[in-house]
């Protein structure tokens, strides 16, 4: 029966959703125009977003490491550096290169000697410091000049300068997106019922993707992880929305003309898809509560991407269905997705066995996942492929001992305390070396912070003693130390670095006159001292560098960082001291994870349970579904324990949230269908029909999400992103297996619990009556006197006389069947 709603139905009025859907469909040309404008805008604005590649940026603002990093940014200059290794070179050639590199414009210093720290295995390692801060583009120019000069050698460069890592990641993600697009097209062609629906779905995805990327700039700054994987995860997580709408449209279009079918299917899909998206959003909401702010950053990006996917499905896709409707009708084909009655029969036959097996597996998974080896830095994780920068780093690490440096920050003004701290730290085996103003040699065995009398300074600088006394007197006057002027200047002591820089100022002002040789010596010393002061002395704090013999990532290292702070606090009991470095960053990540892990787990379960509670109107069903998915999460993260492969802590938080929020949709599809069918037929038939119905949806969404995860895990050189992809792909496969081969049995034996914990929610009913041809869509109760044309999912109390075209019609027994 192809007809619109009857006149009587029109008289009684349409629902709000139908009115909204009608406006969307009828105004599709305007919507297309606005969408094109927004797409063009987004094509440009997608480049406006600032990408943050430093994970420490997202540390809690009250963490000690974050405060230390902020102080270093404000108070000290960090010059650009690079580790340059030249392989296959003799010691003589290596030594000859050092002065040549120093002569390159922009190179401030080159650290090289003939010890194994700089020459080993026929390779030379030059530690180059540039004359510009690490944020200055001039560093890159100087680095390129160094590379150009050494281009004839076997060269490997390790540096944090520039943004080559992000450029590499962007290129890799672009390649992955091409593969993902191919996978999506293949899966859609396989699972579709008409070829014409594929371009509709693809265009809907593209609109959502581009609009989401084009609005990232509104967030100001996003992490490199969010920038890299959000688009791929958006496609994988939100593909269900367009597919649900498309399937609903095809169902309605069997009875209704194109326009009416789109309107009715949209009005039904909005609440259905909206409810489906709530579980995914609910799982991501948990990350908003993390102290480590990378969680909220990624959660907001993913939630925004899902909202744009909903917007594209509800606003743009109806117009696309109208546009491609004739093509959809002409290109129908048989379904390539097979029926799987054997799975349902197997599940029914094993309903008393598999739940026990699942519980045992879940307990084992929980125990193993509790011992999951987490990494908090890059030292313990790796990607399946290496980019050029990582290969250079690996080559340098293979030939030379890597350095683990920490920066100790203390209040400025007391060189004696700083010297005592460095002396005490130097006694520990865990400390390889230290560097501060108090132990850097300046001239003739004197350290920068050594205090010199006028005579000592005169001998060191080659000044007349009388001239030195004049300079010391001027220094005392400038610093308001008038007691020194009145007393004996001969015993007045001033730190070498302070006096040298003061003399340089006086020479520039003309108060002190020096010979050309003295002036040159002073200028050379001034450059070195200003460099040291800029790096190690600020307005309020001084910085000391500590090089450890310990690895960056280990419990022993983390414990020793506490020991360093304990020693420093002994000398500054009433003042704040700070410690920063890769090891302290990782230690801070570990402490944040201890809290965030509990928060994410609890919040994600509570939010998803709340959504499921009102979806099923039962307290028992949410518990069963969440236990199944939580068991899948435990099993997923038991694999790193079994293989001994470290996983970045952030990957666990992100993937567990996505599993709880997205993979649970597979369980919802099965549970909803089974709840609908179990009262209409034997439980065995109900579970068989349920799996036949749910399999196309699960295999479509699940295969895309899992393949996307595995592609990310295998095709990127960024270890954190690779770990997220691998875990997501593995977790999705586990979830698919469990909802197909364990959840049905749990539903069969837990049906009584679900029924006993059910509750009813008062619903608003609308009285409808009509005569002639009436189109009915929805859950109804009442009497019908006439001939029925269409698809029924109903229980009829009374007499029926039907021609059964497809499906089944069975008389139900009064006693409930097992």
Protein language model regions, located:
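Juxtamembrane segments of multi-pass membrane proteins
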Residues: 58-60, 64, 75-81, 89, ...
């Amino acid at each position: 029966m192809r007809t619109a709603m009857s006149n009587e139905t029109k008289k009684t009025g349409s629902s709000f959703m139908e009115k909204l859907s009608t406006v969307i469909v009828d105004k599709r040309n305007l919507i297309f125009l606005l969408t094109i404008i927004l797409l063009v805008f987004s094509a440009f604005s997608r480049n406006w977003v600032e990408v943050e590649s430093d994970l420490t940026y997202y540390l809690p603002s009250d963490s000690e490491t974050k405060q230390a990093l902020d102080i270093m940014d404000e108070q000290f200059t960090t010059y650009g550096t690079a580790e340059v290794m030249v392989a296959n070179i003799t010691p003589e050639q290596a030594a000859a290169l050092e002065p040549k590199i120093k002569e390159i414009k922009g190179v401030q210093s080159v650290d090289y000697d003939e010890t194994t720290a700089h020459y080993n295995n026929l390779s030379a390692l030059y530690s180059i410091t540039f004359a510009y801060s690490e944020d200055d583009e001039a560093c890159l120019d100087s680095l390129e000049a160094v590379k150009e000069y050494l281009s004839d050698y076997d060269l490997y460069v390790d540096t944090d300068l520039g943004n080559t890592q992000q450029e590499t990641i962007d290129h890799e993600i672009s390649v992955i997106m091409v593969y993902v697009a191919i996978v999506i097209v293949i899966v859609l062609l396989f699972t579709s019922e008409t070829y014409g629906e594929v371009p509709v779905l693809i265009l809907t995805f593209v609109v959502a993707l581009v609009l989401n990327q084009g609005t990232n700039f509104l967030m100001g700054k996003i992490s490199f992880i969010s920038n890299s994987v959000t688009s791929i995860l958006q496609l994988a997580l939100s593909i269900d929305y367009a597919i649900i709408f498309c399937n609903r449209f095809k169902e309605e279009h069997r009875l209704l003309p194109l326009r009416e079918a789109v309107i009715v299917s949209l009005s039904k899909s909005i609440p259905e898809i909206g409810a489906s998206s709530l579980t995914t959003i609910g799982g991501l909401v948990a990350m908003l509560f993390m102290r480590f702010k990378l969680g909220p950053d990624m959660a907001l990006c993913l939630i925004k991407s899902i909202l744009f996917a909903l917007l594209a499905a509800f606003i743009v896709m109806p117009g696309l269905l109208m546009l491609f409707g004739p093509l959809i009708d002409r290109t129908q084909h048989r379904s390539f997705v097979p029926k799987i009655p054997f799975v349902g029969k197997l599940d029914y036959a094993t309903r008393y066995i598999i739940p026990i097996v699942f519980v045992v597996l879940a307990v084992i998974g929980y125990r193993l996942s509790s011992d999951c080896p987490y990494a908090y830095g890059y030292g313990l994780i790796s990607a399946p492929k290496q980019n050029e920068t990582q290969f250079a780093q690996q080559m340098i690490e293979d030939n030379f001992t890597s350095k683990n440096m920490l920066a100790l920050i203390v209040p400025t003004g007391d060189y004696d305390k700083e010297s005592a701290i460095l002396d005490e730290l130097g006694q520990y085996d865990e400390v390889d070396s230290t560097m501060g103003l108090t132990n850097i040699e300046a001239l003739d065995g004197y350290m920068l912070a050594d205090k010199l009398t006028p005579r000592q300074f005169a001998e060191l600088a080659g000044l007349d003693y009388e001239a030195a006394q004049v300079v010391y007197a001027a220094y005392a006057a400038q610093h308001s130390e008038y007691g020194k002027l009145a007393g004996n200047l001969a015993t007045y002591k001033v730190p070498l670095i302070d006096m040298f820089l003061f003399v340089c100022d006086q020479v520039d002002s003309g108060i002190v006159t020096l010979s050309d040789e003295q002036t040159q010596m002073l200028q050379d010393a001034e450059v070195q001292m200003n460099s040291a002061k800029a790096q190690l002395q600020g307005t309020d704090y001084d910085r000391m560098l500590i090089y450890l013999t310990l690895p960056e990532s280990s419990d022993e290292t983390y414990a020793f960082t506490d020991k360093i702070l304990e020693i420093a606090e002994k000398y500054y009991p009433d003042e704040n001291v700070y410690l920063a470095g890769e090891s302290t960053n990782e230690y801070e990540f570990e402490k944040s994870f201890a809290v965030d892990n509990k928060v994410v787990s609890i919040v994600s379960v509570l939010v998803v349970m709340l959504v499921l509670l009102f979806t099923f109107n039962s307290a028992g069903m949410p518990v069963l579904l969440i236990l199944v998915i939580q068991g899948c999460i435990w099993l997923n993260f038991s694999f790193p324990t079994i293989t001994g492969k470290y996983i970045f802590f952030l990957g666990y938080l992100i993937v567990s949230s996505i599993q709880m929020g997205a993979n649970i949709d597979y369980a919802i599809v099965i549970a909803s269908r089974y709840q609908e069918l179990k009262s209409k037929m034997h439980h065995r038939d109900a579970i068989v029909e349920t799996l036949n119905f749910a399999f196309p949806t699960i295999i479509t969404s699940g295969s895309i999400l899992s393949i996307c995860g595995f592609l990310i895990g295998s095709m990127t050189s960024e270890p954190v992103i690779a770990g997220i992809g691998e875990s997501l792909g593995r977790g999705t496969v586990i979830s698919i297996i469990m909802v197909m081969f364990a959840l049905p049995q749990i539903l069969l034996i837990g049906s009584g619990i679900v029924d006993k914990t059910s509750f009813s929610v008062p619903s608003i009913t609308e009285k409808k009556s009509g005569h002639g041809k009436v189109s009915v869509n929805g859950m109804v109760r009442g009497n019908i006197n006439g001939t029925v044309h269409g698809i029924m999912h109903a229980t009829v109390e009374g007499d029926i006389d039907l021609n059964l075209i497809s499906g089944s019609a069975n008389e139900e027994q009064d006693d409930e069947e097992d």
